[in-house]
Amino acid sequence: MSTAPPDPATDFQQRLSAVEGRLRDLARRRLEGRTEPDPGTGERWDAGQVWAHLGEFIPYWIAQAERVLAAASASPVPFGRTKANPERIEAIERDRNRGTTALWHDVREDLNDLRAFLASVSDRAWRVRGLHPTLGVMPISQIVDRFLIGHLEEHATQLENLRPR
């Protein structure tokens, strides 16, 4: 029996492949309705808003994680944003009507970038810490889980819960 800690990259890669398959299937569907209300804001999104958010958050959070890693600091490195970030809101509004096919194309490329990022993180780097403005100190493994892999899974579930048109 191995006493080595589990490799987060392997788990993240497996989860990424699974959520990519879910999103691929969802991109083929025409969905209507709105998501369940966000627990914090009460906000409800249509499918276009969810796809636009998928298209904007993946590159953003990869860049934030890379920034934390590049700082090579023993102290937690400030990173991130909140839901109220104006650039986030503007990107979602700007792209929500682009169409699922175009947004899925962008998301698929972003997922490939995420796959490459995950492969590039060393075992030691998974413990490097960042400092989020509201969530506090988080190691890279938690940043990736919360803002990338888990976030993708959350929005895939939102899309799955919308009605087919």
Model-derived segments and spans:
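Helix-loop segments that flank and shape redox-cofactor active sites
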Residues: 21-48, 70-76, 120-136
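A general structural signal for short secondary-structure boundary/capping elements
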Residues: 95-99, 125, 137
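Short, structural beta-strand-to-alpha-helix junction motif
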Residues: 46-47, 99, 139-140
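Alpha-helical transition-metal enzyme core signature, strongest for iron centers
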Residues: 16-23, 47-65, 85, 90-93, ...
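Long amphipathic alpha-helical segments
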Residues: 124-127, 154-165
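Short, helix-capping/interhelical loops that line the mouth of catalytic, cofactor-
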Residues: 1-12, 60-107, 164-165
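Alpha-helix boundary/capping residues
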Residues: 54-57, 72, 121, 133, ...
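Individual transmembrane alpha-helices with interfacial aromatic-anchor signatures
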Residues: 134-148
